[in-house]
Every structure is written in C-alpha cells, then in structure tokens.
Amino acid sequence: ENIYLNGAVMGMDRAFMNQHFDEIVEFSELQEFVDVPVKNYSSGMISRLGFAIATVVRADILVVDEILAVGDFKFQEKCKAKMRELLEGGTTLLFVSHNGDQVKELCSRAIWLNHGVVMEDGPADVVYDKYAAMMEQS
C-alpha cells in the first residue's frame, strides 16, 4: 500500500503503479519492508521509496531535494546514475543540495538562493565556489 499511496500523491493510478511495482521495489531495495507501514520507515527508507516512485513516472521535470543527504553510499551512487540516465533522456533535473561535489558532478548550471533571493546564477562550479566562499566568511 505504501507504493500505491505515494503513487497516488504523484497522480499515478493503481494500474500504472501495478505495472511498475517490481521496478520500484527493486530500485528502492525495500523488498523485505514493502509491507511495513510507512510510519515505521526511517527517513532514508522514505527517501528511497519516494525517489524510486518519482523516477518511474518519467516526468519532464524531476525535483530532487536533498535526496543524497540520506541513505548509504551505494544507494547514493545508484541515485546519481539514475539522475544521469534521466538527464541524458531529456528530463530536466531541479537538484537541491548543499553538497558542492554533488552539485558539480550532476549539474551544468546552478542557482544559489538565499532566502528566496538569487545570489548567483551560472556554471555550477563557479556558483558553488562563490557560495562556499561566502559560507566560510560567515
């Protein structure tokens, strides 16, 4: 039910979720926890499930907010590979992170926001380096 509920929140019907159920479970690596209520999931488990469902939807734009801040290294690498695959397929990725290495690795362009104000917009490495310099000063 966890998968169907999350899918419904994203506007996917039960038939679509049935069609992609095995793919979602396999990617999330939650096979042994698939029947455990979400309220008993850790934040990492919730993120795994949400990311797996979001990536089977094949949307034009995928918003990924700090997904790589949770989970183990192996799963983070799996997520990065999936994001690269989606980017190569034409999906626009809105990637939110405070991790400079991840931003530089996954993004060609970055926008640094500070309380909703655009501080910098440009190549990811340049924008992140300016952000990091500012953070070191404060």
Feature-to-residue mapping (PLM):
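A short, proline-enriched helix->beta-strand linker immediately N-terminal to the Walker B motif
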Residues: 55-64
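Q-loop/switch helix immediately C-terminal to the Walker
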Residues: 1-8
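A short, surface-exposed alpha-helical micro-motif characterized by mixed small hydrophobic
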Residues: 103-105
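Helical segment within the ABC ATPase nucleotide-binding domain
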Residues: 76-89
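Conserved ABC ATPase "signature" C-loop
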Residues: 115-116, 131
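Conserved ABC ATPase "signature" region
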Residues: 4, 16-33, 52
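ABC ATPase "signature
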Residues: 121-122
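H-loop/switch region of ABC-family ATPase nucleotide-binding domains
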Residues: 97-98
